[in-house]
């Protein structure tokens, strides 16, 4: 009678092969000599480098707010506040130790400065003030553009240079500005737009659509990666200093409104620049 292998024979063979495979695996060898994982410092005061969004508004239709907190090892902090009608619904700790999501409920909260207290298990604390502003008007009171409007789309950098002093900003990655080079920044800015608003009204334009004016702080690589167009955002809450300031942007919009011009704010949310902290 022929003796056929039984199931137990195959199991023994499989276990032997698996054992040999593990012994010879490069991964096994690497793991045996790998450096220990970095121990995060949970004893120092929490490092709160940045909070996004930079401020928010009371009496929004949706009272919930997500704060993205950035700082070294901030993942391990707890967060509390004693501001009236501000409730911390939850904390979400991400894979990265340097981010923490804080979900707030602002139902009934009045405008003011919220003290957010970040604390570690050793009792050390960091307090950050977070501004809750009053809304100028409800969203339902704002009128957007429609089919009756004549839109003029433009790149501010390519329109008019009203303030040559902001062509190059010390400390920014891109230090190049040259109108003779097609791929570099040319120096156009918000002040240049403000000085020529009558040009648009004379054309019969009723709405201006600016390509993004938010910060695009990355190297131009001699024009290979220039961001004069504005589509490589590195800060969603700051106008690029080479265009002007947040205050100048608001002033421009107010002046446009006085002249019967609407302003479309172009913002890119499906991607950001590769120099953004995210």
What are these regions (language model features)?
Residues 1-39, 43-49:
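Bacterial Sec-dependent N-terminal signal peptides
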Residues 34-75, 128, 133-135:
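Beta-strand/beta-sandwich contexts
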Residues 53-56, 81, 93, 215:
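Hydrophobic/anchoring residues in structured secondary elements
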Residues 60-122:
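Immunoglobulin-like IPT/TIG beta-sandwich domains and homologous Ig-like subdomains
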Residues 123-242, 246-262, 272, 277:
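N-terminal structural segment of carbohydrate-active enzymes
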Residues 268-270:
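Catalytic metal-binding/acid-base residues of hydrolase active sites
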């Amino acid at each position: 009678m022929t003796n056929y292998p039984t199931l137990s024979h195959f199991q023994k063979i499989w276990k032997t092969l698996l054992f040999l495979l593990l012994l010879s695996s490069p991964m096994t060898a690497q793991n045996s000599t790998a450096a220990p994982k970095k121990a995060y410092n949970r004893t120092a005061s929490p490092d709160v480098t940045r909070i996004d969004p930079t401020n928010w508004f009371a009496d929004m239709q949706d009272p919930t707010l997500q704060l993205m907190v950035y700082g070294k090892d901030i993942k391990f902090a707890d967060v509390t506040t004693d501001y009236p009608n501000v409730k911390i619904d939850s904390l979400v700790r991400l894979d990265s130790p340097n981010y923490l999501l804080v979900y707030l409920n602002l139902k009934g909260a009045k405008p003011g400065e919220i003290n957010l207290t970040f604390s570690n298990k050793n009792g050390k604390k960091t307090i950050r003030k977070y501004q809750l502003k009053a809304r100028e008007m409800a969203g339902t009171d704002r009128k957007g553009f429609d089919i009756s409007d004549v839109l003029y789309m433009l790149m501010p950098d390519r329109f008019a240079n009203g303030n040559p002093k902001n062509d190059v900003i010390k400390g920014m990655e891109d230090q190049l500005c040259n109108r003779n080079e097609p791929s570099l920044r040319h120096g156009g800015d918000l002040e240049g737009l403000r000085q020529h608003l009558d040009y648009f009204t004379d054309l019969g334009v009723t709405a201006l659509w600016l390509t993004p004016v938010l910060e695009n702080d990355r190297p131009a690589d001699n024009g290979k990666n220039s961001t004069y167009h504005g589509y490589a955002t590195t800060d969603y809450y700051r106008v690029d200093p080479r265009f002007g300031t947040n205050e100048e942007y608001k002033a421009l919009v107010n002046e446009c409104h006085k002249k019967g011009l609407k302003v479309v704010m172009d913002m890119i949310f499906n991607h950001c620049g590769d120099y953004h902290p995210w």
